Amino acid sequence: MLKLSTNEIRKKWIEFFESKDHLFIEPKSLIPKNDPTLLWINSGVSTLKDYFSGKVKPPHKRLVNSQKAIRTNDIFNVGLTSRHHTFFEMLGNFSIGDYFKKEAIDWAYEFLINVLKIDVKKLWVTVFEDDQFTNDEWIKLGIIKEQIIKCNRDRNFWDVGNGPCGPCTEIHYDRGERFDPNKIGSKLILEDIENDRYVEIWNIVFSQFNNDGHNNYTELLQKNIDTGAGLERIACISQDVPTNFDSDVFMRITKSVEQFSEYKYDMNEYFHPNVTQNKINFAYKVIADHMRATVFAIADGAIPSNKERGYILRRLIRRTMVLVRRLNINNLLWVDAVVDAIASTMGDFYTYLKDEKTLTKIKMILNKEVQLFEKTLQLGLNIFENSIRNQELDKEITFKLVDTYGFPIELIKEICEQRNVKVDLEAFDAMFKHHQLISKANKANLKVMESQNESLMQLDVDSTFHYEIFRWENAKIITLFNEDFELVDGLDHEDGYVVFDNTCFYATSGGQQHDTGYIIKNDQQFFVDDVFKAPNRQHVHHVKNASLSMNEHVILQINEQDRKSITANHTAEHLLHYCLKHVLSPDIKQEGAAKYPHKVTFDFTYHAQPTKAQLDKLENVLNEMVQSNFDVQELHMDLDEAKAVGAAAYFEDVYKKLKGKLRVIKMGPSIELCGGTHAHHTSEIERIKIVECASKGAGSWRITMVTGHDNLAKYIHDLYVDYLNEINHLKVNLDINDHKLNDLYNAFANWKNLSIDDYDLLNEKFAELKQSLINFKIEFDKQNAKQAIIDIKNTFNTQLTNKRVHVFKNTDNKNIFNALNELINENQDTLFISFNLDDNKIQYLLAINEKFATTNQINLNKYIKELNTISNGKGGGKPYFVQGGTSEQEKLDELLTVVDKWVINA
C-alpha cells in the first residue's frame, strides 16, 4: 500500500471520483443550516439530505466530497480506543438516481487496489445475506470468496424505520497479527468483535427500498448510493501507524503541545503497554482530538456557552484543560501553538484556516474561554480544599463543583486520586440524575403537551386568530378539555382548556408572551391565564374556575394595555436586531428573544461584551428609528420571495414547515419573517431604554430593554424603591456617625422628581452609597470583631489550667477561631477547647501551640476523632488546630464528659 499523507489521500479521492464524472462539493459548515434535528453535521451525507429527499435539485447526479463532522455521543471513548474521534472527516461519493450497485462496488475496488495500491488479500467485505448481486460482484472483481461475509439485517441493512433504506456492504482492511495479540484471527470479523486488526474503512449503502413505517418495503423508482470512508482510518493504515492518533495530522498537534511539557508522547506504548505512559498518551490524544473539533467549530461560528452546541464546545475545551493539567503545563502558550499547528496541517484544504482574521478570532475566543475556566477552576479548587472531611469528598460538594463551577467529573476524579481522597461517584451520579429530573420537571410546560399529547395531536377543527382585534363578540366554543386534556362537553366551576372558532387571544410563540384576559358569558367572567398553540395551529386557552359548555357563544376580551405594550416591545426587538448587526457587528447571531408587557429581552452571541459606549450608541440609533416614524408594513410572500427581498429568517427551519404565504414585517430598513403582533408605526414605541446587557455565559449576552413612557416611569420608580430597600437593609444595626455618609444617604432617600433620564445617575449614586455603606459596615464589623475576640480571650483566661474549655452560644465561629489563634501563641502549653451552640448544631474547635504540639508529639486529630465518634460529627485539620461539628446538640454533655478526661502532658 502507498504511504500517503492525509492531504494526499483526500486529494486522490476527490480527483478519482472527478474522473468518474462526479461534481466536487465543498465541505459545508459544521453548524447545520436549517436542520433543527442536528446540533452538528455528523456525517458526510448530512449536508446532502435535501438532494436525496428531492426538496432541492442537486447540481449534479454524481457528487463527491470530504466533509468535516462532529460526533460527541462517544466522547469518553476518545483516547481509549484507536479510532474514536469527536471531529473527523468523511470521504463520500454519491449517486442521486444515477449509477447503482455495480459502479459503486467497481469504483471502490478500483480506488483501493489501483490508486492506493492495497493488496487485495488484505481486504474483507461484508454483504447483506439476501444481496446476491453484491456478493457476486465482489467475487468477480477478485475478493477472496472466504473473505466475503454474509450478514443479517442488524449488521448490513440500513433502515431508520420510515423512508428510504437498503442493504449495505462494508470494506475492512486486515492489519495483521501484530494487531491481534490474543491470536483470535478471523473470528474477530466473523463475529463482529471490537478489534484493531480488521478495520472498517468504507461503507456503501444501496438505497433501493422505501419503508412505509410498518416494515412494508417497496422498490424505489429512484435508487441512490450513499458512501462513507473514514479519512483518518485510511491515513492510519496507509502510514502504518498503531492508531489514528499516530497519523501525520494528529502528530503535528501533539508535537505542538509536547514542547510545553516534560512528558512525551510515545506511539510504541501501543505494543509495549505501560500504565504511566498510557495516561500520558491518553492526555495527548484527547487534547489533539478535542482541539481539532474546537478550532473548526469556532471557525464555523460556534461560541462556547451553556446551551446546546455552545455547551458541547465548552465541555470539549474544559476536558482538554483537565488533561493539559495532567501534563503539568502551567502556561497558556499552548493554546496559540495548537491553533497554529492545526491551521498549518489542515489549512491547505481548509484554506480559511490560514486567514489571519479567522485565526485571530479563533485564538481570542479560545484564550478567553481558557482564562475564564482557569479562574473558575481556582475558585472550585479552594472549595475542594476546604470541603475535605476525613479524606472524603461529600457528594453535595462534588455536585456543586460540577453544576456550579463546571468541573468535568474526570477532573474531580483525578484530583481525588492525587490527594488520596475518596469520592462516592455513585451517590453523585444518583444526585445528578435526580437534579436533571427536577430541572426537566420545572421546565415542563405546555410545549410538551403540544408535541406529545394525543388529544391535541388529533385535534382537527378550524380556528382563526385575528391580529388586530382586542374584543371578539361572538366566539363559539368548538372544543373543551379538562385539566387532564380529556375531551369534555362542559366545565363546571373548574379549570380547563378551550378552543374557539375565532379568537383575539395571541398564543405564546416566537418568544412573544400570550395574551391574558377574560371569557365573558352573560354576567360572568372567566380569567384566561395562558394560551398556546396546538400542533395543528389552533389557539388553546387555559381558563380558571369556569362554567362553559360546547357550542356556547361567548365574548372574548384581552388585556388591551398589556397587548399594546407587548406589541411595542416586539416592534422594538426587530429594530434592536437590525441595529445590533449594523452598529455592533454583522457577525451577531440571535439566540432567542422574549417579549413581555413590561420588558423585552434579546439573546445573542458575540465574542466580547458590548461596552457602555457601544450600548449608548445603540440606544441613540434605536430612538432615532422610533422618531423616524417608519410605517410597520405586513407583507405576505413565500420563503424564497422573502429571502430575495432581504428578509431575515432567523428560524428558517420553522418557516419551512408552514404552508402558504409567510408573514413578513417591514419597518424602515428592518425586514424579518415574523408571526407576532406589531405597532402600526415605530413612533408608537415612544422611547426605548437599554437597562441591562448581561452575560449568559462566555460569548453569550442578553440585552434587556424597556419601552414606552408609562413603562419607563414605572421601571425607574420600582428600581429606585428596590435600591432604597437594599440600602435600608444595609443600614440596619449600623450606628452611622459619619456626616458625609449621612448626607449621601439623605440625598438618596429623599430624591424627588425621578425620571428615566436620571437612570445612569441613579445607578451611579446607588453604587457610591452602597459601597460607602459596605466600607463603613466592614470597619464597624472589624471593631465589633476586635472587641468580641478580646471578650472570648478574657473568658478563657479566667481559667488557669493547661486545658481550658468553654461553651458559647450563637457566637461568630470566626471570632472564636481568631481568639484561639492568639491564645495559643500567648499560652505555650495550654489546650483550648470551644463548643459553640448555633442553629441546632454544635461547632467545636481545639487548638494548642504548634511548637508545643510538635515537641510533645501531640496530634489533635486523635482527639477530634473521639468527638466525631460520640456525636456522629465531621471534622479534622492540622495536628495543632482542628475544627468540626455535629447536628446532634443533645450530645453536648457527653462531649464535655469525654473532654474532662483528657490529660495534656508536657
Curated annotation (Swiss-Prot):
Q: What is any one GO biological process for this UniProt entry?
A: alanyl-tRNA aminoacylation
For molecular function, the Gene Ontology terms on record are: alanine-tRNA ligase activity; aminoacyl-tRNA deacylase activity; ATP binding; tRNA binding; zinc ion binding
Q: How is the cofactor bound?
A: Binds 1 zinc ion per subunit.
Cellular location of this protein? Answer: Cytoplasm
Q: Which reaction does it catalyse?
A: tRNA(Ala) + L-alanine + ATP = L-alanyl-tRNA(Ala) + AMP + diphosphate
Keywords recorded for this protein, A-Z: Aminoacyl-tRNA synthetase, ATP-binding, Cytoplasm, Ligase, Metal-binding, Nucleotide-binding, Protein biosynthesis, RNA-binding, tRNA-binding, Zinc
Which segments cross the bilayer? Answer: none
GO CC term, one of those recorded: cytosol
Protein biosynthesis among the record's keywords?
A: yes
* Record comment regarding domains: Consists of three domains; the N-terminal catalytic domain, the editing domain and the C-terminal C-Ala domain. The editing domain removes incorrectly charged amino acids, while the C-Ala domain, along with tRNA(Ala), serves as a bridge to cooperatively bring together the editing and aminoacylation centers thus stimulating deacylation of misacylated tRNAs.
Name of the featured protein? Alanine--tRNA ligase
- This protein's species is Ureaplasma parvum serovar 3 (strain ATCC 700970)
